[in-house]
Amino acid sequence: VPVISVPQAFNEDDLYVDLASIFDVPLYLKCEGFNFAGSIKLKAATEMVEAAERDGVLTRDSVLIESSSGNLGVALAMIAASRGYRFLCVTDSRCNLSTRRLMEALGSQVHIITEADPVGGFLGARIDYVEAMCASDSRFVWLNQYRNPGNWRAHLKRTAPAIARDFPGLDVLFVGAGTTGTLMGCARFFREWHRPVHVVAVDAVGSVTFGGPQARRMIPGLGSGVRPALLDESYIDEVVLVEEADTLRACHRLAHRGFLFGGSTGTVVSGAKSWLDRHGSPGITAVAIAPDLGERYLDTVYQTNWLEDLFGKDVLDPVQAAHPFSESLSRPTDAGADPGRGTLVTSRPDADVVPLPLPRSGN
């Protein structure tokens, strides 16, 4: 019987979902969200914290600080609670409310950036804030997931070898690009593997990672407003860009079959399907990495008002048409109707963002 004493010791990462019956393409989805942090970011967080401890950078007086759109923040909040560190996560207004509350429940503080940098976007503004905090107080320790080699080494040592073991005949691997830690770790591993693997990076339209123009992005996770320092394009064979509307459709298509995945996973799956529709063959062996699960996206990706306000009422039409209950339930028209009279009732979450108090030097 497995017994653990720290939360990061549990990580079920050898589960795959066969998506052939859902998307009509030969694709296996590697699920990375079955741990107490809920995402693949647990691996990078653990690697970076342990390296900082070995190097003597982290001490009992240290205060961890990191810029995160959500998932790494949760992983660091969990590890900080387990190891007795204080942690300040610097995120922005796109971060899901449930994610912010989860970090707070784990004892961490959250600062929300509400104004994007004109050039670097929200990420640039978050990094500026982190740098200012570090300059103001020497107790702050910034692991810097955007430059820390521990980010990609975690996947060189764990994620990629696991895929190679489970799929010795792998032909193509689809990996989402955020900080590019997962992407670079896997790409470096398979560059040295015994057979060629076509590594496809999946990014969001509006991200500048691969040189595209910056544009509005509302789903946290993949994509970046600043080119990641870890990225080395020489290891990558191809890049697929995904519109956020297609991310939403992929998420809902999976949900209609009982699989609730996060926005990053929806982007990767949509990109993989697009590529396989064009290049796939019946004998191809393809794997995509699912970074996260969907519970933290219930107020955004899976919330009707949020979807329609940002992407229009018809964004999910192709998905709804394919759903067996698409015509069975009428859409609610009166949010205040009496639920006892058979009318569906919906509620709209509060969209106000209230920054939390910040730690001050000497406190």
Predicted regions and their residues:
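PLP-dependent amino-acid enzyme catalytic core
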Residues: 1-363
